[in-house]
Amino acid sequence: MNRANSLLLKTLLPVAIGLAVVVWLFASEFDIADWKRIPWNLHTILAIGAAWLFMAGREAGLAWRFRCMTDRDLSWKQAIKVTMLCEFTSAITPTTAGGSALSMVFMNREGISGGRATTLMMCTLFLDEAFFVVMCPVIFLLVPSSVLFGFDTGSVGSGIRWAFWAVYCGIVLWTLLLFAGIFLRPHKVGEWLTRLFRLKWLRRWEEDIAGIAHSMVTTSEEIKTRSWKWWTEAIAATVTSWVSRYLVVNALFIAFATGASQLVVFARQFVVWTLLTVSPTPGGSGVSEWLFTAYYGDLISDASVALVIAICWRIITYYVYLATGALMIPSWVKQGVRNHHKQ
């Protein structure tokens, strides 16, 4: 019962935070006249439908990655199940924790051995971080910094700019550490991390870091046997999943704000998701809604329309996972109980 109550609280907390921010934004920015000017026609409906299709593409990309990285040992149904459970855990935990760490638990439940599942978890983590590292120079080659961060000349604009570069530098360092730990010197990196987190002010994470250090060694031994074809498919699936997630907002802008530059909309999604990797709230609740309306406001003529797009975006990319996960978790727990009794 306590576990059920804890899960219910973790599910309702991000919803409450998100709704509180939405109510505040509605009270301060929503104008019914702007809402009435939105043309609810076939064009709008088709564009919203495209946004849902792009989100399905995101899940297909992640499921494809689980399939290829497990050498097709996971069926499509199992891969989609693991994907949705990962998305649910991401939705109810701070984005700094994320759902990737639990993917090994979900894969293990579907028949992948614990050691192998740990290896695959480390690889997916590395691929996601590497995507951000590589995409940054590409984005800034296509869209100048003045356009990405020129939406506000005050403290909000400069704050987002500095926060982005701070987070991006952190991602680069973390990715380099993962690369060295997985591909180059896993034992040395593991020893260094273990010693570092024995320091008094870092000791609270010592146990977690010890687990990561051990996973790096295990992953390094497993990865050496992998072919370029395996890596190419995993990279393609990673790119598909992230690009599809970005394109959700492009489709929503086509629905509600056709005058905005689609390239700028796409590029700003990279900034948004980079910042959300360090959100302290579950699934970025509250932070996402505010950040979206503030950051995209200059591309939309009416603040009310920006709020409508933000809400649609969060429903498609977040709240649907809370609902789906809440439906899937009970059967997943029952399956674990049955497996335990069989043993």
Predicted ranges, named:
Residues 1-37, 89-201, 281, 285-343:
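Transmembrane helix-loop-helix hairpins in multi-pass inner-membrane proteins
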Residues 7-12, 41-50, 221-235:
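Membrane-interface helix starts
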Residues 35-44, 72-75, 111, 219-227, ...:
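Helix-boundary and loop/linker segments of multi-pass membrane transporters
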Residues 53, 85, 123-130, 236, ...:
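Hydrophobic residues within alpha-helical transmembrane segments
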Residues 60-85, 252-268:
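Membrane-embedded helical hairpins/re-entrant loop segments and their flanking transmembrane helices
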Residues 77-87, 116, 263-274, 304-312:
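Alpha-helical transmembrane segments of multi-pass membrane proteins
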Residues 82-88, 191-216:
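Juxtamembrane inter-helical linkers in multi-pass membrane proteins
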Residues 208-256, 260-262:
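Alpha-helical transmembrane segments and their immediate interhelical loop/hinge regions
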